[in-house]
């Protein structure tokens, strides 16, 4: 099964996973609209790939009050939009053993960037995807292996990714059991640590000289793309695969039982996953 989507909105496209995925989708023939805050990087992205294969929209998704108008403009400009990738994210260290050092505005910024903004984006973009029926459409979330097993250093980040992982399960079940929405697939990519600027931007990690760790971006994209091309709805990548298989089977069985009781018989939440 090939990647089915031809007009993709990539949230968080100026670096790292988002940029690498966007470029792989362009290579496969998709038109990808990159979204981010850094105009110079967005301009470079379009210049590299050409306006016939790429476009850009400078936007800060944490500006929640502006998302509705921005989403309406995106839909008007790109009516063929059939896939939204929710990828942007930030990570900060958080130590509850030193509560006086906790910066609550930074904590809230992390929650807004990694989770709350996605709710608003889905609310305002999903109606367009629903209206495309029966043509296929997709919402792709990029969570983290830390959604499955957290690490103490970045407790809030892990919590936001766990929330996103849970959201994907419930949203997938809801859409699969709704006649007007069942053509909209909910796909979750679950990365391990990847060598991106996510770690390089953290002062405490830079101070330790501990920013270059994890899977290379090239290896990550190759593995993630294989899952997207297969049509998987859950795509654990690299070392996350073993953790995913060890932890999620029992939870999946329990969740499918809940879905059957509450939403009636139909596709299980994991329908289409490998």
What are these regions (language model features)?
Residues 28-44:
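Conserved glycine-rich Rossmann-like NAD(P)H-binding loop of the short-chain dehydrogenase/reductase
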Residues 144:
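Residue(s) in the substrate-gating loop at a strand-loop-helix junction
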Residues 49-65:
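Rossmann-fold cofactor-recognition segment
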Residues 173-239:
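SDR active-site lid
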Residues 12-15:
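Conserved glycine-rich cofactor-binding loop
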Residues 122, 160:
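Active-site helix of classical SDR
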Residues 68, 75-76, 90-108, 131-133, ...:
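Conserved mid-core segment of classical short-chain dehydrogenase/reductases
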């Amino acid at each position: 099964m090939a990647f089915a989507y031809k007009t993709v909105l990539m949230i968080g496209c100026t670096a790292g996973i988002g940029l690498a995925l966007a470029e792989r989708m362009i290579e496969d023939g998709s038109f990808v609209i990159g979204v981010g805050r850094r105009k110079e990087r967005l301009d470079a992205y379009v210049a590299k790939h050409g306006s016939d294969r790429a476009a850009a929209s400078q936007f800060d998704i944490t500006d929640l009050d502006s998302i509705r108008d921005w989403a309406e403009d995106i839909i008007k400009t790109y009516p063929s939009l059939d896939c939204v990738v929710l990828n942007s994210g930030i990570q900060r260290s958080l130590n509850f053993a030193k509560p006086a050092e906790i910066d609550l505005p930074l904590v809230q910024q992390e929650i807004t960037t990694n989770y709350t903004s996605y709710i608003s984006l889905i609310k305002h973009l999903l109606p367009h995807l629903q209206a495309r029926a029966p043509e296929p459409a997709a919402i792709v979330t990029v969570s983290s292996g830390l959604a499955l097993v957290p690490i103490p250093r970045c407790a809030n980040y892990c919590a936001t990714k766990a929330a996103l992982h849970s959201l994907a399960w419930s949203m997938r079940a809801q859409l699969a059991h709704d006649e007007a929405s069942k053509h909209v697939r909910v796909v979750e990519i679950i990365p391990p640590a990847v060598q991106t600027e996510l770690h390089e931007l953290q002062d405490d990690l830079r101070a330790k000289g501990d920013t270059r760790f994890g899977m290379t971006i090239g290896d990550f994209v190759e593995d993630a793309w294989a899952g997207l091309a297969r049509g998987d709805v859950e795509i654990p990548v690299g070392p996350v695969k073993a953790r995913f298989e060890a932890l999620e089977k029992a939870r999946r069985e329990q969740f499918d039982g809940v879905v059957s009781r509450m939403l009636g018989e139909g596709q299980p939440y994991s329908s289409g996953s490998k």
